[in-house]
From Swiss-Prot:
It comes from Tropheryma whipplei (strain TW08/27) (Whipple's bacillus). The keyword Cytoplasm applies. GO terms for molecular function: tRNA (guanine(37)-N1)-methyltransferase activity. Belongs to the RNA methyltransferase TrmD family. Its EC number is 2.1.1.228. InterPro entries: Alpha/beta_knot_MTases (IPR029028), tRNA_m1G_MeTrfase_C_sf (IPR023148), tRNA_m1G_MeTrfase_TrmD (IPR002649), tRNA_m1G_MTases_N (IPR029026), tRNA_MeTrfase_TRMD/TRM10 (IPR016009). It holds the Pfam family tRNA_m1G_MT. This is tRNA (guanine-N(1)-)-methyltransferase. S-adenosyl-L-methionine binds at residues 110, 134-139. It is found in: Cytoplasm.
Amino acid sequence: MFVMRCDFVSIFPEYFDVLDISLIGKARRNGLLDLRVHNLREYSEAGRVDSSPYGGGPGMVMSAEPWARAIEHIATGESLVVFPSPSGQPYSHDLAQSLSSEMHIVFCCGRYEGIDNRIYEWTATRLRSSGISIGDYVLNGGEIAALVILEGFVRFIPGVLGNPESLVEESYQYNLLEYPVYTKPAVWRGLEVPDILLSGNHDLIREWRYKKQLEITQKTRPDLYSTHIYETDS
């Protein structure tokens, strides 16, 4: 049975207590995921992991040596080392699907003004490594980004989702956003469920949902809409 291993290195390991809940926690208990958390300070001298930046500037920069020690201890030749970073490649549906086939991912969650750039050069000469961005904004650290990346790709691991068909109509599956969904009651505070969803005609329902996907995507993500139209016409 395929068991993916993910290691998270951080100076705030408490961030990852959430790995015991929801689908990820269930997958962990069922033996589908092997998740391990490491405190970066354990790989440093006297717990010191940062220093002032060369050239001046605000804040502190994380030293390369503790990260190198952690990576040497945790990673193997099969590992992919991921640095969550605003300067990394954008996270996407396709990238999430690709990550789900990895045997071992090591997430290096930086803080402060970032990590000494030499750690990226050093890692790239020894292991497969990648910077990944979850959006055009800056967070206080890489922990939340690492969790977002994890949430995105574990859905593709067989057995994690209760209903595998959920992936078939997933938002972004065909460069389209998700259609609106409804549940009981049929009338809520004067607002009604669209009649077509109550018709039982699955062909019409499928057509309606696709139309709504097109409308929503064109309105809020015209870039995805253009890609979908191009791929459909190709």
